[in-house]
């Protein structure tokens, strides 16, 4: 669904909740901020089919920027903030980004890129930095109305580079005009989640770094569906369990290493949390050891859903707990 429609239907409903700080962004605010971001991109001369790159921690403004690019018809590349400056530089240049957005948290890396990205519009969140314009100041002057030529963009993510340099997974953008009404054709961001029973009432927990393929695409999809996304700034087993309990989480996404860490929790601590609202726990990214998955199903029940796809998304297989 279009963020503008969600903003009209339930403007005051939480769209994003940061589990650590408790900061909340409503669907109305998400729509307004992403409109301002889209206006900024057009003011920079970015047109449908152009690219931007973002390198951010799990930041409060991560998804307003993503939706700004999406509704502008741009291709957006999320970059791991754990990479070395030379690796970040390679990806920014390889994806042909015309704008690069990062944060004060990553200022050291950002400053190492200053000279090499001289032809790229550079923005910094959370404060000024030499060579970088304040993103918040830049959008503050922009209209909260939609741009006139809204069309559908999409992500261009990179492989891990295990056989050389990271390789961009570039899909042809449809650049379809975006729908505004409930009965218009769904653009696909939220549609894929219907297989997991997602509705606008779902509460989704995202515990992983947002630059990864699954967190990026799942959170975007749940937000497009009109859901609420609970985002962990950093993964912690007890913080995750508390978030499921406190926010009445219905859906979540994990990787096997998180499962292993969960199993190290003392059994007496496990039973302290009410996880009864948790309906679907999705996992992927790597093979899950059989013994680990058996113990996870024993603890959480048959709510685990595994899929095989990867960043390339060249085929997708899904299996639930009963089939497994």
Report the location of each language-model feature.
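Conserved AMP-binding/adenylation subdomain of ANL enzymes
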Residues: 177-207, 211-251, 265
């Amino acid at each position: 669904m279009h963020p503008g429609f969600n903003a009209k239907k339930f403007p005051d409903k939480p769209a994003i909740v940061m589990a650590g700080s408790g900061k909340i962004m409503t669907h109305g605010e998400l729509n307004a901020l992403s409109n301002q971001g889209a206006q900024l991109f057009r003011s920079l001369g970015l047109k449908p089919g152009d690219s931007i790159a973002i390198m951010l921690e799990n930041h409060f403004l991560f998804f307003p920027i993503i939706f700004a690019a999406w509704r502008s018809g741009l291709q957006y590349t999320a970059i791991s903030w754990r990479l070395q400056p030379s690796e970040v530089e390679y990806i920014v240049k390889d994806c042909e980004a015309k704008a690069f957005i990062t944060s004060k948290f990553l200022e050291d890396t950002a400053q190492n890129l200053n000279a090499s990205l001289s032809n790229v519009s550079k923005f910094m969140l959370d404060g000024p930095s030499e060579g970088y314009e304040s993103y918040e100041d830049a959008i503050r002057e922009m209209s909260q109305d939609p741009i006139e030529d809204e069309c559908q963009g999409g992500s261009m993510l990179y492989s891990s580079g295990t056989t050389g340099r990271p390789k961009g997974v570039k899909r042809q953008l449809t650049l379809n005009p975006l729908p505004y009404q409930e009965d218009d054709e769904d653009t696909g961001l939220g549609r894929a989640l219907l297989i997991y029973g997602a509705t606008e009432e779902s509460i989704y927990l995202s515990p992983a770094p947002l630059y990864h393929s699954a967190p990026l695409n799942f959170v975007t999809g749940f937000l497009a569906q009109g859901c609420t996304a609970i985002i962990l700034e950093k993964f912690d087993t007890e913080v995750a369990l508390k978030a499921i309990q406190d926010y009445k989480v219905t859906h979540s996404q994990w990787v096997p290493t998180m499962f292993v860490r969960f199993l190290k929790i003392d059994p007496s601590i496990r039973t302290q949390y009410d996880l009864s609202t948790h309906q679907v726990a999705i996992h992927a990214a790597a093979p899950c050891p059989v013994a680990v998955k058996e113990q996870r199903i024993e603890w959480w029940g048959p709510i685990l859903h595994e899929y095989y796809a990867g960043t390339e998304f060249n085929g997708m297989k899904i299996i639930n707990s009963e089939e497994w």
